[in-house]
Amino acid sequence: MQDGTVANQLAGRLRLAAACLLAWMAAAAVFCVQAQPVTESSVKAAFLYKFTGFVDWPQGTFERSNDVLVIGVLGSDAVASDLEQMVAGRNVDGHPLGVRRPREGDTLRGLHVLFIAAEREARVRDLVQSTPGPVLVVTEQDAGLRLGAVLNFVNDGGKVRFTASLNAAEARGLRLSARLLAVAQSVEGHAR
């Protein structure tokens, strides 16, 4: 009878050890599978991607209906990397999305969206002026809209928001969707 008790004790210990091992494995799996934290760069990348669906470019901007819609990211490798992952294999209105990382001296021609990461005010002004035509220029500069940007990221209590300039959009031949303007923190100018 004593052998049965020892066997029962051993079986109980094995069950306890197995339960502990399973609990440890489950905890480790949860820890390893947790989603990546949301970063400011990933939020800005998501906005840049989504903006493309709420802008009408003028007739003739794209030669063919399946031309790539190119988003340029200047000055933020983190935003560019997040955006590249986000837009891989995606289309907007039949246009595949692509990301370019222009460097100092590179031409900005061929871009449909240009995000200019934090730069000195004079540099932002020069970049905006050197990007003519129907380009959705997005900045993150306090004076971004005043410098000619169409959209500008702002920090609102730790949240990324954006402001919009209807005058800058009109000057570039762009039409911003009412749905986009409805979620902007503020909208400057007026539609004609």
Each language-model region and where it sits:
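Short hydrophobic alpha-helices and adjacent helix-cap/hinge residues
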Residues: 2-21, 26-192
